[in-house]
From Swiss-Prot:
Annotated function: Catalyzes the oxidation of 5,10-methylenetetrahydrofolate to 5,10-methenyltetrahydrofolate and then the hydrolysis of 5,10-methenyltetrahydrofolate to 10-formyltetrahydrofolate.
Protein name: Bifunctional protein FolD
Subunit details: Homodimer.
Positions with a binding annotation for NADP(+): 176-178, 201, 242
Pathway listed: One-carbon metabolism; tetrahydrofolate interconversion
Organism: Gluconobacter oxydans (strain 621H)
Gene name, Swiss-Prot/TrEMBL: folD
Keyword vocabulary terms for this entry: Amino-acid biosynthesis, Histidine biosynthesis, Hydrolase, Methionine biosynthesis, Multifunctional enzyme, NADP, One-carbon metabolism, Oxidoreductase, Purine biosynthesis
Length: 304
């Protein structure tokens, strides 16, 4: 079989409906929040902090607030100026850590140059770190201990589980080794008993590795990096990337890290961009916030 002309499966890929799966998860969270509150527990609260005035981030943060209210949670938005110092942000996080009405804290990335994102994520109390990026939750994940899992990798895993009930022994290749997606994704796949390969910017044979993948997760931020001849016939492809690129008539369009039109005839299952991984990220944020509220309540019940 030629590497340049991969054998095609008998039919095109099935689209993994991220919107539909995210909607079902959000609806489930809403029902569970209502039940949690009916039992006399505090309404779960999510605080989102945005530093700066990036329009895209503002839209994203406001969308999170809308979804938070939709499932019956409290939303606390903190919009800080671009000039905010690291100490000022850390002071706010300390206040949010101490606030019993807040069960989850998310600081929108990226942050201005004067603020160290590692210091900020580690300042969030581990039981309120609903993005799962602090060193405590990252350490728990690497050790296979239950903790809060980063939203995007968790969403990717749920999409994979909608296709594969058992991933034991499957070869999973993750392209991209970021702390945000690639590394935690690899840990989650290991927990599913996959054989995991991680490719990164210094990997010399990324294309060849991708061609061996039963499961291919791509999170590089490089638009349409993965072409059709990178895909193993019948593979499941999860495209985490999203980039706005020029289109005809002076317009723009959104594309992923995978050349969808080329991959679609080859893959067995594939996520679209948009409408694949993106909706799952916010749904998993709400899921994590409810889990954090439950954990906080369990500690309170045990100590009373």
């Amino acid at each position: 079989m030629s590497m340049l002309s991969p054998e095609k499966p008998s039919e095109p890929a099935k689209i993994i409906d991220g919107k539909g799966i995210a909607r079902a998860l959000t609806d489930q969270v809403g029902r569970e929040v209502a039940k949690f509150v009916e039992q006399g527990n505090t309404i779960p609260g999510l605080a989102v902090v945005l530093v700066g005035n990036d329009p895209a981030s503002e839209v994203y943060v406001k969308n999170k607030a809308i979804q938070t209210h939709r499932v019956g949670m409290r939303s606390f938005m903190h919009m800080l100026p671009q000039s905010t110092s690291q100490d000022e942000l850390l002071d706010l996080i300390a206040q949010l850590n101490a606030n019993p009405k807040i069960h989850g804290i998310l600081v929108q990335l990226p942050l201005p140059a004067q603020i160290d994102p590692v210091a900020v994520t580690n300042a969030i109390a581990p039981h309120k770190d609903v993005d799962g990026l602090g060193e405590v939750n990252a350490g728990r994940l690497s050790l296979g201990i239950d903790g809060i899992v980063p939203c995007t990798p968790l969403g990717c895993l749920m999409l994979l589980q909608s296709v594969h009930k058992d991933m034991t022994g499957m070869h999973a290749v993750v392209i991209g080794a970021s702390n945000l997606v690639g590394k935690p994704m690899a840990q989650l796949l290991l927990k599913e008993n996959c054989t995991v390969t991680v490719a990164h910017i210094h990997t010399r044979n990324t294309k060849e590795l991708a061609r061996e993948a039963d499961i291919l997760v791509v999170a590089t931020g490089k638009s349409e990096l993965v072409r059709g001849d990178w895909i193993k016939p019948g593979a499941t492809v999860i495209d985490v990337g999203i980039t706005r690129v020029p289109a005809e008539n002076g317009k723009t369009r959104l594309v992923g890290d995978v050349a969808f039109d080329e991959a679609f005839p080859i893959a067995g299952h594939i996520t679209p961009v948009p409408g694949g991984v993106g909706p799952m990220t916010i749904a998993c944020l709400l899921h994590n916030t409810l889990q954090a509220a439950r954990a906080t309540q369990a500690v309170a019940d045990a100590s009373s």
